Amino acid sequence: MTKRALISVSDKNGIVEFAQELTKFGWEIISTGGTKVALDQAGVTTIAIDDVTGFPEMMDGRVKTLHPKIHGGLLARRDLDSHLQAANDHEIGLIDLVVVNLYPFKETILRPDVTYDLAVENIDIGGPSMLRSAAKNHASVTVVVDPADYPTVLGEIAEQGETSYATRQRLAAKVFRHTAAYDALIADYFTKQVGEDKPEKLTITYDLNQPMRYGENPQQNADFYQNALPTAYSIAAAKQLNGKELSFNNIRDADAAIRIIRDFKDRPTVVALKHMNPCGIGQAETIEQAWDYAYEADPVSIFGGIVVLNREVDAATAEKMHPIFLEIIIAPGYSAEALAILTNKKKNLRILELAFDAQDASEVEKEFTGVVGGLLVQDQDVVVESPVDWQVVTERQPSEQEWAAMEFAWKSSKYVKSNGIIITNDKMTLGVGPGQTNRVASVRIAIEQAKDRLEGAVLASDAFFPFADNVEEIAAAGIKAIIQPGGSVRDQDSIDMANKYGLTMVFTGVRHFRH
């Protein structure tokens, strides 16, 4: 019995050559629309879909393959006489191979000029139906959705006259992943169109970006997936100019770095980061000076760390960075001279270029945190704050310099692991106390790191002080200004302690826990 293939593709790369090989093996080819035109023009003999169904394409192509003579040919089980008899009774020819890819829905909704009607018209109905029918009957039918699989299919047909069951099963699994992802994109688009903020079903789809050697530790298997709708300001979108492949930990740290730098747009700023905690942040009038401040903040912890800069890296800055062992440098650009300096004898240094003009758009993405048996979903912590909304709660008002330092410290504190404390002046971080299980311990760590540099320093806390002992420790160190959210039932104790020692303290009203 002559084998039959049904081919209907929007991506025509390689399809002519594929069909030509099938005809050499004696296969009949059924085709539709533009695919049939392309194959006919290439000299491939095809059968029109309406010659099979006896029914014309209609409704602007919306109805063409949704027909029993197509789906019966795909779904008929070859091992059941009743199925074969039904096919014979209704003159349904069996179809042994389906090659289909779908209307470009994703590409359509990414167009800047897309309209709702255009998006809807690019929802494929017949294609997924054929793919799913063929995949369900993979015991007998080969289904191909990816041109990358053409050589495997042709090779097996050439060698043994048909594909192996293992190949058909693998391709069926690929199809179900593909159609599920396609439907997830459509569901996400419609969910956003109707403004559903808490849908009862969460459908998200990600594409494999990079298989990883291992995860956080060598005993953990891992891979890197990126959002199927690409985000322009993301590590997945960064262009790697030098160095080894990014590791699992590199990607997590780099993501933390580009989140931090979003909050520092107005002035040249450099952030040094280690284990997802900032170890040094510097801001100045030039990127070179900002680097100096970030490095000076903690020249020990920066070793083996990640650095992100919000201005193009120039030669002078590169000269200062080059002697330091860094894992990754991220910037919106590099001068040719700077790149030559940074890559000299540094073949493993990962240098990433990332455009910063899409930072605001990246802030609307949800954050996902896996828990055993579930997934937590939240907005990013990107609330817009203004000092005019802050409240001075002490008798002493901040000086102009203290206000500037507190604004800088408050932005920086957002990214320190809770319980998080950070000490800064108006140019650089001086001490970081991250991730302690009690807040006074974080205060002590930050003070110890900042000692001998506390003149004019301020302290920021990501959450309120539960007890006044924190303020007492701060005052004893010589720090004169505190910024914190407030909100404790014992706030007045902290205020009284600040007044006792002549400190100024500001409440922001916004907490910034980070776990």
Curated annotation (Swiss-Prot):
InterPro entries listed in its UniProt record: AICAR_Tfase_dup_dom_sf (IPR024051), Cytidine_deaminase-like (IPR016193), MGS-like_dom (IPR011607), MGS-like_dom_sf (IPR036914), PurH-like (IPR002695)
Domain MGS-like, residue spans: 1-145
Listed pathway(s): Purine metabolism; IMP biosynthesis via de novo pathway; 5-formamido-1-(5-phospho-D-ribosyl)imidazole-4-carboxamide from 5-amino-1-(5-phospho-D-ribosyl)imidazole-4-carboxamide (10-formyl THF route): step 1/1; Purine metabolism; IMP biosynthesis via de novo pathway; IMP from 5-formamido-1-(5-phospho-D-ribosyl)imidazole-4-carboxamide: step 1/1
Enzyme Commission number, as recorded: 2.1.2.3, 3.5.4.10
GO CC terms of this entry: cytosol
SMART domains: AICARFT_IMPCHas, MGS
Biological processes annotated in GO: 'de novo' IMP biosynthetic process
Keywords from the UniProt entry: Hydrolase, Multifunctional enzyme, Purine biosynthesis, Transferase
Parts of the chain that traverse the membrane: none
GO molecular function, a single term: IMP cyclohydrolase activity
Pfam families the UniProt entry points to: AICARFT_IMPCHas, MGS
PANTHER family with a match to the protein in the record: BIFUNCTIONAL PURINE BIOSYNTHESIS PROTEIN ATIC, BIFUNCTIONAL PURINE BIOSYNTHESIS PROTEIN PURH
Domain notes: The IMP cyclohydrolase activity resides in the N-terminal region.
NCBIfam families, per the entry: PRK00881.1, purH
The protein's name in its UniProt record: Bifunctional purine biosynthesis protein PurH
Species name: Streptococcus suis
Taxonomy of the source species: Bacteria, Bacillati, Bacillota, Bacilli, Lactobacillales
Originating gene: purH
